Amino acid sequence: MFKFLNYLFPLSLLILLPVHAAENPLFEKLNEINANPQLQKAAYNAGKDRAFLCKYCHGVDGNSVKGSIPNLAAQNPAYLIQQFHLFLKKKRISKTMNEIVKNLTPDDMLNIAVYYSEQQVKPQKPYKPDLLSKGKELFEARCFTCHGKDAYGKEELPRIASQPSEYIITTLSSYNSALEKRAESAMSKIARTLGDKDIEAVAAYLTSLK
């Protein structure tokens, strides 16, 4: 069940400046959990209890209930911890999330990240399958270096495989137009090389991944 005990951080569309372990002690605690099955099980169960705060948008099992909202299922735990930190510090802006994180303790953030990282992503409905080939070509040319060949991410970069197509399109379009509040130079520069049809193709490809 607890697949991430087999690696240290399977760490992964939204590139942000990393919050390194030296700046966030929760990364060290995540390391400890990875090395201790009992701690891991306790964190998972505690995270499952606290995830009720997230289910109305992200789903009980981390599979989004709205196309505009990202899946949290199978997301990299270090990335989720990083995002909690950014929402808390208002370095990432979302009225809903900025309020929710106020009600979370550091341990809540860690435990929720552990819980969602262990959930399975449900297959997405096919989105414009005729664009898959072009989307794969664009992904391999522009995205895989950071997000990995399977789009599972790495380090503190997110898993973008199996995300809802609407979410991918909206986010890439925001980066493209510099409206994205998290806009970071690397991601913005890449997004600005993509036209509307390119973005649709990338979304079609990422949505098709499992």
Give the ranges of each region predicted by the language model.
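Bacterial N-terminal signal peptides
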Residues: 8-16
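Bacterial N-terminal signal peptides that target proteins for export
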Residues: 1-9
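The canonical Cys-X-X-Cys-His
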Residues: 54-61, 112, 142-150, 202
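C-terminal capping alpha-helices of c-type cytochrome domains
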Residues: 23-29, 33, 102-124, 166, ...
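Sec/Tat signal peptide C-region and signal peptidase I cleavage site
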Residues: 17-21
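Gly/Gly-Pro-rich "capping" loops immediately C-terminal to redox-active cysteine motifs
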Residues: 44, 62-92, 98-103, 136, ...
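Electrostatic cytochrome c docking/interface patches
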Residues: 22-51, 114-138
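Inter-heme linker and motif-flanking segments adjacent to c-type heme-binding CXXCH motifs
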Residues: 63-64, 90-93, 118-130, 145, ...
